[in-house]
């Protein structure tokens, strides 16, 4: 046997030598010179003969039938080993190959990475195409650079590669990796440059099928040069991935902030309701406390009657039991004292009763707050998972409008049977919230396995398999409450092995049910057993009242009923997918006579394959019980509020209120004393019933109206002072009472203890029922100036940090024995000391909460970098911080350390990321040395002003939410050139001034502040990078109508507003609503201030204005000149409300009427609509009655703009003056309407003071009867460049002095003769008319208008008049001699004074020259023609010059 093996080995070595060109006979001599051997495709079944090659460095064995690695012990120099495409099942036999650098074991049957610990020089390791399930055994391979694990069964990465920091190339293609979180583990490989997860040669990893796969990898691994065999070294690719990731982070940060805001709003509603509920008990407590203190004063005075002062040694309240007993022994007026004591006892009982009610309300409030937080607490983690998975995990909160919501709702109701829950007092179920979860990762697994079942079955059975899909409730372990973390793990990762229920009989499977009772009753039973000793039934219901259901999609597959005696496991049911148990066989089933058949259908299933149970819906529900749940919004509590005031007899507290009245009316009934407003010497002595100040040791000023304690400095012996129920806001006046031991300042309005000092002997202090807020400041004052204090009461004050107040006070005031009436135990004092010790920044706290990481980890998270870094890598308390170590600290997270101030950070010069959230900080001090800060978080403190950070020029993120901020220092943000996120939510900020230069700002969260004025938005208009703005909860939302559109219009770059993405339709609506709108905000923005009262002129031309909305109008009362030329106004809009406007210029607009026109009537035809717009068209004209109606309606409208005198409406396209409603401008003096489309002068009858009317360049042909029907004050009328042919209807213009008729179509001289009715006319133009071709018009007009001083731009003098008379007389004479006329000639002197008939000349021929200008009906002699021709030529030259000089009139200013 041995000989055959040796013979076989010899043949193998011969084959080895043959394949590598070596001589078998000489191998003993030549073997030492061989460094490389190769064996391909059979002939080498075992590794043998390598001892012959001691210097071998490379060995390649491919496609051999080798089953194990052996025989390599002699190969001490081996550096490269290939054993590929063999049958190797285990990595072994390599321990001696310590110089190995490259190892190729691909295409084998290896299932585990092992025995590589000693190969520390290994650089390349290929284990692809094996059956490896886990990455392990690589910890010692520090030099590994190339690792190929493709084509295996690996589903997780974990931290197994953390030690391989030199790794440059990694191939994990063809595995079962399905989670993005697994890929983030690769971020700890700093040298990784080539990563392959989706190599085309292998099957696809499930993770590669997810959305945003490439983006996720490239963002987390920015140093990659090649990814999935592609070159990704281009800078643009990395920038795109970074930009996408940044947008995702911003988006989810916005959504999380929106959720937090909604939670805060809900909690504020609860708090408001609590305050309303507490109002009645508080009023009762105050009333009884007042009466009680009044009686105590009476009792003290009664005991001290006959004495000059009361016993100052009695510092305890007289209502203490010991005092009451001692008082009973007093013999002086025993009956009165007994009555007082009896009434005091009754009052104490009532105070206790109402205090108990206050405590009950507080308890219910805390229960509801806890429930609200629990309900909201699931949403934020879901959003974080959604961010981490880059949207592959998505959830949606349902509403009644969603079909899937209604489906789930009906499913729950259909599977609830009241019979099953009757024993627990449950009558129904109320669904509060349904969350739909879409986990793409789990869904792919589910669909993949489901598809395999379908493929393995015949087509005929596929439909039956689909019917095996069910929606079932997951059955949680009843003995373990549903923790948020556990539920989130199921939703994100599915039902893993660790999630299987370990129930009796070792039932190992995912348990689901189609019955609510099967899912829930075990939990209810367990909770009842656990708390069976509780006495209150309502409390028992509260244990299980709220619950969570997880609805899953389940593929039951082949399902059989469970056998009674066999445990439910896959081994007992090998051929099935699930096992079910009907309800009647369940051990905990409560069976009995039932009125329904629900139990027949109720089953519990056990599903073996976890991937076939897909979580889809999370349902939050509440059981409806016979005992109603205590709620701040219950009917009972509302009755407390309303009915107690309106109808005490019906109120639920009616008996208590009656009892209160009876107690108040008990004897003795103390008469009210007159209230003191001020204090003087006489009053003090009178109250103390003594004449010597030094004798006064007790002074009771209870129940007055005092706000100051003057003249108390003389009371040097005062030991006891009661100033309760007064009007004090501070206690400055008691600082000099050095002997004071007892001070009662309750029920006042004290807001600060500043000035409260020097009371070293004070032992009892009552500050309850005041307005103290700043716990840190007030505790400091008490600590410094009340060193002997024993009892302190600070209840019922609006403290800023009430949760830690008690520990803070006890820890600082070490002499205290009682706080708020409760004894301070040693344990509580010790806990308080530890608490105070932790409120200071020490070296130990720096070590525990800091990190030295140089770069922020690339993690998709919205949490502050300081929080992330200190969780990833802390320094640890065991280290010692030297001076150099301080400089290494880059991140510091001191959240929730109850700090009162920031100290000891002077050496942290390189600090980049810091967080001090949820502390007691009141100032931003102690950060002066941290000028390299990039992120600073100060949420949840008591800071009132942003200061001291102007030098932090590298700051990129600043968050100061939930503080008391009212503003910031000037120029705080001017130098922050990298600031892109600013969050100032839930503060008291009133202005955004100071943010104008924050040009890099991308996100601004400033919800729930006090911003009220629209102008504040203009401070953000220059921030072109701002894409997310949250202004929710500010006053501007209610002050500004259409607030959302207002902000969108003014900040067009925004992508999201108030947590809601901006839709394109909203942008369009904003432009329609606010585009071209002149508002006070726009004016304030341009002026830089909003003091509009100083404005006298408003000049806003060429700004696309469509409407004017200047509010408040009273602010613009001094504006007298308005110029809005070249805009898009269609009416006067808001200008009509400006009270003192005198000059209004609206040229080049689209004015249709003074007031906005109503929409056209729908019943009008298209032709009628055309006539409304262009009356000259003649289409659709409705007759005179319509015009008359317009005139009547215009005349009946009330006048407006009483101060307006000058109006410019040129070039507006006006065609109808009646629709313009100019009659309402009764005081108008100058009206300019040039360049329009006016065809009729009408609708101006009421303008009785109008002096100048300009209608040049219009379409006027003639004047109708109503044009100038009434006598007018018009002095100048401009009608140039129209279409006038007639000049009638001007007789009412009795005061007209200037008339401009140039460039019309007047061709009949008889029309000019009609002007002689205007005897006042001084200036006239008619050039450019056809009549001007006949030179007779000038002489005729000069002759007929005796007052004319200017004609066609030329002055008219006496010579012109003489020439006119001469030429006209000569013309008349020649006419009489040449032409027979039908009328007798007139006396030449009467030409121009008396209207004469027109000249008629017939049958006269002009051969040439001038005659053609006069028309065919006039013929002149050659002499007359020669004279008139020369004159006409001169006149043409003159008129051309005048026309060039003549332009349309400008507005008088």
Swiss-Prot record:
Report which superkingdom the organism of origin falls in.
Answer: Eukaryota
Specify whether Repeat is a keyword of the entry: yes
- Gene3D superfamilies linked to this entry: Ribonuclease Inhibitor
Report residue spans for region: Disordered: 302-321
LRR repeat positions in this chain?
53-78, 97-119, 120-141, 142-164, 166-188, 224-248, 264-287, 344-367, 671-693, 694-715, 716-737, 739-758, 759-784, 786-812, 886-908, 909-930, 931-952, 953-975, 976-1001, 1023-1048, 1092-1115, 1116-1138, 1139-1161, 1201-1224, 1225-1247, 1248-1270, 1272-1292, 1293-1317, 1319-1345, 1365-1388
Q: Name one GO cellular component term.
A: cytoplasm
Matching entries from InterPro entries are given as: Leu-rich_rpt, Leu-rich_rpt_4, Leu-rich_rpt_typical-subtyp, LRR_dom_sf, SDS22/Internalin_LRR
Q: Which SUPFAM superfamilies match?
A: L domain-like, Outer arm dynein light chain 1
What UniProt keywords apply to this chain's record, in alphabetical order? Answer: Leucine-rich repeat, Repeat
Q: Which Pfam families match?
A: LRR_4, LRR_8, LRR_9
Q: What is this protein called?
A: Leucine-rich repeat-containing protein 9
The scientific name of the source species is Homo sapiens
Q: Specify the taxonomic lineage.
A: Eukaryota, Metazoa, Chordata, Craniata, Vertebrata
